[in-house]
Amino acid sequence: MSRPSTKDIDLLVPNEDEHGYLVNILQQLGYKSASGWGWSREDGFIFDLFRGNSIHTTQLLESSLKEENHTLVKEFSRVYLGVLNYYDIIISKLFRGTNVDNEDCLFLLKAKRSEINLATLEKRFRETASYDVSEGAVMKNLEHFLRLAQKEVI
């Protein structure tokens, strides 16, 4: 499964003040609002900055700041860069349910199969979905993904 890489990066900034500070820095660097969350400049690269505990419309069950909910990538003098746990990455993508998001989730599942328990994923997804206004629709996304995973990964 090979496809061109996108030129964007999704960042979750849990602290509202830090989110505002980061937006200000991007504006100083010439970035302009490109969408509800996106900031871009003429090179086409987009930063999607999500505030608080939500990615797009997905409200995470727990704070990404909790140690078990992220992995440190790099710590700079004023920036802590971490990546969400695999479950929250997959859940936030499956809530959108696009083909590209499904491909991303399958790729992650294949690459990290020994670290991702499908029963845990399903339980966590169902709990997250129970708080969403479109619970039925997102549950269909999960069912579709599990069928794909059964065919392609398991």
Q: How would you describe each model-predicted region?
A:
Residues 1-154:
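Compositionally biased terminal segments of proteins
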